[in-house]
Amino acid sequence: MIILIDSGNSRLKVGWFDPDAPQAAREPAPVAFDNLDLDALGRWLATLPRRPQRALGVNVAGLARGQAIAATLRAGGCDIRWLRAQPLAMGLRNGYRNPDQLGADRWACMVGVLARQPSVHPPLLVASFGTATTLDTIGPDNVFPGGLILPGPAMMRGALAHGTAHLPLADGLVADYPIDTHQAIASGIAAAQAGAIVRQWLAGRQRYGQAPEIYVAGGGWPEVRQEAERLLAVTGAAFGATPRPTYLDSPVLDGLAALAAHGAPTA
């Protein structure tokens, strides 16, 4: 059994992959903890049906957090290997000028999405809504040409509340023409997030001559889903397309499992 670790800025998401089980079994459902609650990680390890042999993970929460997670795993008899983005792995070719500068979580997420695809597939747009929102494209040739990073919905809301004198930590409904401050902030955040998806969908369509399939993930997606789907529908209609995002619960863990299963480069 191999433990899979996605250490994000806010949450620690964990699962497992068992290459020795029939059909290379996965966890029934991934589990998420606050990234500061390593006691919860230790308790989860104690519930596993088999003692893990090792762990594979990606960590964007800093060196100290990675060391603390590694210590918790070691206490359970399991060493972890933290992965970094590679120039080429599982067919995904990394187009970053410096390939290892690409966030390991973004890379593993794209690997996970690509692992779901047949050999011939359309362009793919992978949007993850966490502390930061990232939007990454994979071409039909399996090349990642680049992507966007912007503040996630919660960070946008917090920045307005803490960086200004009078704006609240907003909790309002999204509207075309907001009529109070809470609505105005909520609508602005949803518009920014949805607009980024539409921008990259249009860019992919122009670059590849066909509409990208959209995959979404992350805890911030429910907040922006309605506005994103509305703008995508309006935009797609102009091209005779109906873009419908597919939600994935744990594409980073899926990518780690694929890398573990196929022995792909992970140094």
UniProtKB/Swiss-Prot annotation:
Disulfide bonds: none
Primary location recorded for the protein, binned into one broad class: cytoplasm
Source species, domain of life: Bacteria
GO CC terms in record: cytoplasm
Pathway field: Cofactor biosynthesis; coenzyme A biosynthesis; CoA from (R)-pantothenate: step 1/5
Keyword Nucleotide-binding: yes
Catalytic activity entry: (R)-pantothenate + ATP = (R)-4'-phosphopantothenate + ADP + H(+)
Residues annotated for ATP binding in this entry: 6-13, 131
Cofactor binding notes: A monovalent cation. Ammonium or potassium.
Enzyme Commission identifier(s): 2.7.1.33
Annotated keywords: ATP-binding, Coenzyme A biosynthesis, Cytoplasm, Kinase, Nucleotide-binding, Potassium, Transferase
Localisation per UniProt entry: Cytoplasm
Cofactor: NH4(+); K(+)
GO MF annotations in UniProt: ATP binding; pantothenate kinase activity
Positions annotated to bind substrate: 96, 103-106, 181
GO biological process: coenzyme A biosynthetic process
Catalytic class of the enzyme: transferase
Active site: 105 (proton acceptor)
Classification via Gene3D superfamilies: 3.30.420.40
Family classification: Belongs to the type III pantothenate kinase family.
NCBIfam families on file: PRK13328.1-5 (NF009869)
SUBUNIT field: Homodimer.
Function of the protein: Catalyzes the phosphorylation of pantothenate (Pan), the first step in CoA biosynthesis.
Protein name stated in the entry: Type III pantothenate kinase
